[in-house]
A protein has these predicted regions:
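Short, structured segments at the rim of ligand-binding sites
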Residues: 1-19, 23, 29-193
Length: 193
């Protein structure tokens, strides 16, 4: 479908609902709170129904940007008393979630960020396209290195969202298992490989 955005909201709540979360939901929304308010409180993250997902890559990346990360019974409190600044980050492996988080943090951080061993899945390239439409300065190198130059603000955008590759593969698997025929609208073959 079509997505439209008008840039950052005037008000962003500084904390999440502890009853919501506990999974990856919300991890990417943290950057907006931290950039706009200088702090964010989110429920403890780290998994979903599939299983646990370590978040230490995310926390280490936020620390590299200058954030202070405090874990407590309430959740994870992130503060940036001196703002967020560009960083040199190398991920232990090309994590999609960690790459998304670094991109979303770096676009509004002061200075240049170099991200090594970044994920380059179609969803990452689509996020980069959206951020560039909003005014972000991002350069993707062929060796999984991404350079992000922080900007003062992001603007609105229009973008056609990428289809869900997992959903398309699930439908294709169902058709194969049932020996049926199915058409998955919007799926692009080159991004399924």
């Amino acid at each position: 479908g079509e997505l439209e955005g008008e840039g950052p909201a005037d008000r962003i709540p500084s904390h999440g609902d502890p009853g919501v979360g506990g999974g990856d939901v919300g991890q990417d929304a943290v950057e907006g709170c931290e950039h706009r308010l200088g702090e964010a409180l989110i429920p403890d993250l780290g998994g979903c129904r599939i299983g646990d997902r370590p978040i230490d890559f995310h926390m280490d990346a936020l620390r590299a940007f200058g954030a202070i990360v405090d874990k407590s019974y309430e959740g994870i409190r992130l503060t940036a008393p001196h703002g967020l600044h560009g960083a040199n980050i190398e991920l232990p492996y090309p994590s999609v979630g960690a790459t998304e988080q670094v991109l979303l943090t770096a676009v509004l951080a002061e200075g240049v960020t170099e991200l090594k061993n970044a994920a380059i899945e179609p969803e990452i390239m689509d996020l980069i396209a959206i951020l560039q439409k909003m005014g972000a300065i991002i350069n993707v190198e062929p060796n999984r290195v991404i350079f992000i130059e922080g900007v003062e603000k992001l603007d609105g955008y229009q973008h056609t969202a990428l289809f869900d590759r997992n959903e398309a593969a699930s439908w294709a698997s169902a058709a194969l298992a049932t020996e049926g025929d199915i058409f998955v609208g919007g799926a692009r073959q080159q991004e399924l490989m």
